[in-house]
């Protein structure tokens, strides 16, 4: 129960409108809803990956941030699929994740083959070589075949950087979700900001791999 004193000084019409919107959101939790605020932040909810195309723009305007709360089959790679649908290609894709599945690496390989991605860098957690042996070997093969880079570190961050310099398009996805799909509730924010992209890129460029086999890639 929200105490009425919290809204003292606010326009009653705005408070009533917000309350109606909140009631509608609670009632229809299984349907994607949207709300736009004045500072160019956008909020979305999604229950399945197919919903992303309905609730997110094909391209993100510079300076916008889109906040997405999910409780379905959406992971970090879901956003990459959506981003790729709105550009000719990506010069660079960097993904930082605790873990990644074989089918995800296979899909990324197909994008590299098709020229949809020129350079792919994967930052994985220290468990990756030992606990995900097949995926680790697959990624090493991608390093040889495509010039991809694997950096193994004490990493638990979930960041995706995507860029197309010729289109001055720089995106950063901050997320709780790993690359591999799971049914858990996750939250993500997509930022169209060259400065934020550069901030994270500089940070990740400074990380050295602790894995002897991936150091040379």
Regions found by a protein language model. Give the residues of each.
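N-terminal localization/anchoring segments of enzymes in phospholipid and broader phosphate metabolism
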Residues: 1-90, 113-115, 202
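Primarily the HKD phosphodiesterase
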Residues: 76-145
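A generic structural signal for short, solvent-exposed coil/turn residues
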Residues: 60, 85-87, 114, 140-142, ...
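Generic alpha-helical structural element
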Residues: 69-72, 97, 189
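Conserved beta-strand termini and adjacent loop/short-helix elements that scaffold enzyme active sites
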Residues: 71, 123-125, 151-153
């Amino acid at each position: 129960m929200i105490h009425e004193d919290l809204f003292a000084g606010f326009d009653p019409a705005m408070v009533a409108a917000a309350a109606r919107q909140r009631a509608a959101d609670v009632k229809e939790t299984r349907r994607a809803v949207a709300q736009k605020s004045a500072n160019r932040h956008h909020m979305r909810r999604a229950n399945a990956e197919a919903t992303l195309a309905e609730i997110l723009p094909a391209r993100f305007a510079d300076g916008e941030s889109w906040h997405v709360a999910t409780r379905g089959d959406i992971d970090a790679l879901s956003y990459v699929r959506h981003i790729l649908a709105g550009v000719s290609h990506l010069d660079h894709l960097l993904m930082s994740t605790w873990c990644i599945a074989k089918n995800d690496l296979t899909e990324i390989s197909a994008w590299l083959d098709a020229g949809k991605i020129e350079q792919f860098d994967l930052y994985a957690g220290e468990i990756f070589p030992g606990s995900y042996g097949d995926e680790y070997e697959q990624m090493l093969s991608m390093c040889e075949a495509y010039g991809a880079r694997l950096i193994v570190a004490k990493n638990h961050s979930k960041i995706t950087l995507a860029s197309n310099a010729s289109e001055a398009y720089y995106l950063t996805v901050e997320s709780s979700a790993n690359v591999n799909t799971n049914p858990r509730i996750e939250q993500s924010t997509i930022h169209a900001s060259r400065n934020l992209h550069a901030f994270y890129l500089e940070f990740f460029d400074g990380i050295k791999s602790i894995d002897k086999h991936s150091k040379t890639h």
